């Protein structure tokens, strides 16, 4: 069960950094 919550936390973390990177590249292209 702890592994599952760790996986969820990891996914939220990676999703957050991915979103930031997408926004950064979009701002660069604009």
UniProtKB/Swiss-Prot annotation:
Entry protein name: Uncharacterized protein TP_0573
Organism: Treponema pallidum (strain Nichols)
């Amino acid at each position: 069960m702890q592994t599952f919550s760790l996986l969820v936390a990891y996914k939220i973390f990676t999703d957050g950094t991915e979103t930031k990177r997408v926004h950064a590249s979009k701002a660069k292209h604009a």
